[in-house]
Amino acid sequence: MSFIKSRKKIVTTAIASSLSVIATSAIAQDEIAKLPTIKAQATAKQSLKVDQSANTKFVAPLLDTPKSVSVISKQLIEDTKVTTLSDALRTVPGITLGAGEGGNPNGDRPFIRGYSSESSVYVDGIRNSTSQNREMFAVEQVEVSKGSSSSLGGGGSVGGSINLISKVAKKGDSLEGSVQGGTDDYQRITLDGNKDFGNGIAGRVVVMGHHNNKAGQGDDATEYKRAGIAPSITFGLDTATRATLSYYYLKTDDTPDAGVPYNNPNNYAAGSGKPIDVKQGIYYGWKDRDFQKQENQIGTIKLEHDLTDSITLSNTAVYSKSKNNYVWTQPDDSQGNFINPTTGQLKDTGIWRRANTRITDTDSFSDQLALTGKFNTGSLKHSFNAGAEYSKAESDKGSYTITDPNTKNITGAVANGACSLGLVASNGWCTSTFNPNSKDPFLGTITPNRAVTTTTSETTSVYVLDNIEITPQWLLDLGVRWDKFDTELKTNATGVKVENNTDFFSYQAGLTFKPTENSSIYASFATSANPVGIDAGDGSETAVNANNKDLDPEKARTFEIGTKWDLFNDKLNATAAIFRTEKQNTRIQLDPTTYTNGGDSKVDGIELGLNGNITDKWAVSAGYTYLDSENTNPGPSCGRTGPCNPINAAKGKQLPNVPKNSATLWTTYKVLPQVTLGAGAVAMDKVYGNATNTKWVPGYVRYDAMAKYDVNKNVNVQLNVNNLSDVRYFSKAYASHFATEAEGRSAVVSLNFKY
């Protein structure tokens, strides 16, 4: 890869930034009081309430931060036993998960407040937007920032961003882990050991092994297998100069889920648009052909030096490598194989197992240099973070070539005889609508066709964030960031290149009034910019191409008014906010080959939250979000060929992947000194998959339960039952073709230990 050729420049950048930290140490005082490390919890006791973000770009406590931030705490992760980021995000209202056809069809594709945040996922404040299914085994907590926020993290972040906080070496000795088993061949083991070697040195290793089938589908269907390890070592604990080296590795080998077609395919538009009425847990995939193999690695070097007792200089250098290779079944509806176009009745003449394939190999490097701390200018007290960032990513994309003894099987076309009654029993490319056979033999060949295109993206940024205490009752929050973003797509066979080069400013401003020390009322404004190719071509965002190479970044802005209160001796946090996000300059299509900036959309909303302890025995994490979305100017309606229609049916419609109402609840109560009971619910309104609102999945309410028995102070046994009532619902709605059915009821027993 040409990425290797630029490694010398990258290494030089990292060394130069890191040496600036070390050189400063040499001229500083011999003894400097260490700036207290901010912890997610104020005390050693874990809680559902988190007071301070682990991201240093949040320069004030969350209570005094003028924007909505939801934190999935370590306690909530342990209570619910979530194992993936997608599972964890279901505990946050206002977030939905999107499906894809290519790029990232089965990976993390969250929508926050109505807009995609796939390219706005961070690990320890460093962008991590490659297409993948993220694991929770090495995650301490997850922070979800709501609203436009490019001033915090750069391009993207229209509806918000997600930051995963990693488990790294710390002071003290500890050993904890969990051995789990459950329904659907669920098997999982995690081990987390931290050793304090003295002299300011500590090491930590977290390991995980996992296997399960998708709940409700039985054997020979969707299957998940993965293993991971995350070692880290820290030097200089409790000193003015600290260094942390960490590594993360995750390997997965899954059989992906295929989903269920909608009931209004191309040949029967009169269908209502919901998924077809077939049995719960149906699986249209092809075990002998389908797979998804991922490998993700992250290496990090973080250096910190306290210039004074209130100013810290830090540098974080990260190199990551990601692979995502798959062949998965899209249960295609484009050929009209399974429905009678006259009556709309389902036919058992077969679902075409269209093969979607991808080979992606992405390398990236990021370096962040930051100066953080506190200082005064007269009577004004500043808490700030100022820094510079550089990143470069290179993504090779290819696909698999699939051959078959009978080419009509691959096309799925009825005109060629595919999916006829005579082929259902013998042709794996088409399977029964009502009783699909996942074990059909695959007689073809799968050949990799690697590195068809290479996308290179480079970002240079500088920013300043400042929280100013004007008086103890009035706080002013300001932020500005400048990004230069360059992206290039090269077709390797021809050498043809297209590129998009842009730069943009992002801003945030907020004013906070504190009626009391433990409360705040705020008003804020923030912007974001979404340039072409923000995910470096590795994901569902459209990469730069000949049609969009000259377009400007999409723009968004969020207005928010809210309040936050710490109640019951600061053990419980209550929040409320009203907001509007407006997206402007959206890329729209004028004809089959011409795009421009000209679209608009908006989301108005209300958000309520409650996190922490009502009593010492009763804990709760709850939230509600109302989203009123509208596609105010979608542009003309254009197909792949032919002229565009100036009248677009999407105008005035609800945005895709945006439920009007969504709510989450998790609560636990210690009924006896050794017994804790928990219950949860997730509720969501109807969600549309496409812009014209003709494809949709119904709303639902899902219930969960937990019971935990403390054998002693170090060991407990925990039972989690998810989807208690075994309700059938769909977790993802794609814009065409299919929706993804969620898991049925499952139960997991865990033996947990902590020393």
Each PLM stretch: what is its role?
Residues 580-582, 597-692, 725, 750, ...:
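Gram-negative outer-membrane beta-barrel transporters
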Residues 20, 35-172, 561:
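Acidic, small-polar-rich N-terminal luminal/periplasmic segments of exported/outer-membrane proteins
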